[in-house]
Regions:
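A short beta-loop-beta micro-motif enriched in histidine and acidic residues
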Residues: 165, 173-175, 198-200
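Generic structural motif
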Residues: 171, 177-187, 233-236
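Acidic, glycine-rich catalytic/binding loops that coordinate metals and/or anionic ligands
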Residues: 85, 94, 98, 228-247, ...
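Short, conserved secondary-structure segments in the cores of folded domains
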Residues: 175-178, 223, 229
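Short beta-turn/strand-loop junction motif enriched in small, turn-promoting residues
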Residues: 176, 190-193, 243-246
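Zn2+-dependent peptidoglycan hydrolase active-site motif and core
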Residues: 181-223
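Polar/charged, compositionally biased leader and regulatory segments
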Residues: 1-170, 282-303
Length: 303
């Protein structure tokens, strides 16, 4: 392991794309799960100052997930068990009225003649669409590549590739619409993420499987939350209203709903809402399709 770590430290030093280099190098040196989990600290120990400084800017949990994936293991060990649990769990709706019982339309980011979600013209366009089609909700798609994610917060020191694939499902509705908890749990974090095109008001809930495996749900682009960190939450309980432009990061009013199987090295009230296209299998293990919880018919995601 020491020789491998030394070799990897050399390959990563000066590499344009750390993720790409890790995956390529480890394809020739498959490791056990225990070895994969232990590798990153060994690389740091063998690295020179410039590489250590670069690694310090990145999420160590995500790098370990990349290493695990490159070695043929599940990026997140408990992800499959969490997804299996959710397939059979009883869930409440995440908004009121219940999206499962309400007419809706798909809002792929490249929908013809649709203004961008960050363009204030979207509101009038969507209001007209809702009135014309007699429906309440619009859905932004999980796993969709979006051109809007070009701001600096979607890039990092790993390399030139921005994070551009959406890790949640968006539910567009009027500001003030009630956002509710689908599962029992506790409030993990309440935060205001103020950067332009960030989440604005954000709530993260912590849940657990019957075997005690933790997982989380994230609610972004809210109005002022009705809950506080540490609160116990019941299914159907109101978390917050849907936020408007001035408080939700600068987006047309909508809920970003995301399932998270590992918080990686993130300890605050924010989490990655988009992932690298080239590493989609890793990101899909971290944040699987949240329709496991929403239970919306697949037809609503198609035009």
């Amino acid at each position: 392991m020491t020789e491998l770590a030394k070799s990897l430290a050399g390959a990563l030093t000066g590499a344009e794309d750390l993720h790409e280099t890790l995956v390529a190098e480890l394809a020739r040196a498959p490791l056990s799960e225990a070895e994969a989990d232990a590798l990153l600290p060994l690389i740091r120990r063998e690295a020179e100052a410039a590489l250590i400084a670069r690694l310090d800017q990145l999420d160590a949990g995500f790098l370990t997930a990349v290493i695990r994936h490159a070695c043929g293991h599940a990026p997140i060990p408990g992800s499959a068990a969490i997804q299996s649990h959710l397939k059979n769990a009883e869930v409440a709706p995440v908004m009121s009225p219940d999206p499962r019982e309400t007419r809706a339309t798909a809002l792929p980011s490249e929908r013809p003649r649709m203004p961008a979600f960050s363009d204030r013209a979207f509101d009038a366009w969507f209001d007209g669409l809702r009135e014309g089609e007699e429906m309440l909700y619009g859905y932004g798609l999980y796993g969709e590549k979006r051109r809007v994610y070009m701001a600096d917060q979607y890039r990092d020191a790993s390399g030139p590739e921005p994070r551009s694939r959406h890790l949640g499902i968006d539910i567009f509705a009027p500001a003030g619409t009630s956002v509710t908890a689908p599962l029992p749990g506790y409030v993990h974090r309440v935060a205001y993420n103020a950067d332009p095109l960030d989440y604005g008001h954000t709530v993260i809930l912590r849940h657990a499987t019957e075997d005690g495996l933790p997982f989380w749900t994230l609610y972004g682009h809210l109005g002022q939350p009705h809950v506080a960190e540490g609160d116990e939450i019941a299914p159907g309980q109101t978390i917050a209203p849907l936020g408007d432009w001035h408080e939700n990061g600068g987006w047309a009013p909508h809920l970003h709903f995301q399932l998270i199987t590992s918080l990686l090295a993130q300890t605050g009230g924010n989490f990655y809402g988009v992932g690298h296209d080239s590493l989609w299998p890793v990101w899909a293990g971290i944040s699987p399709d949240p329709n496991l919880i929403l239970r919306l018919p697949e037809a609503v995601f198609r035009l």
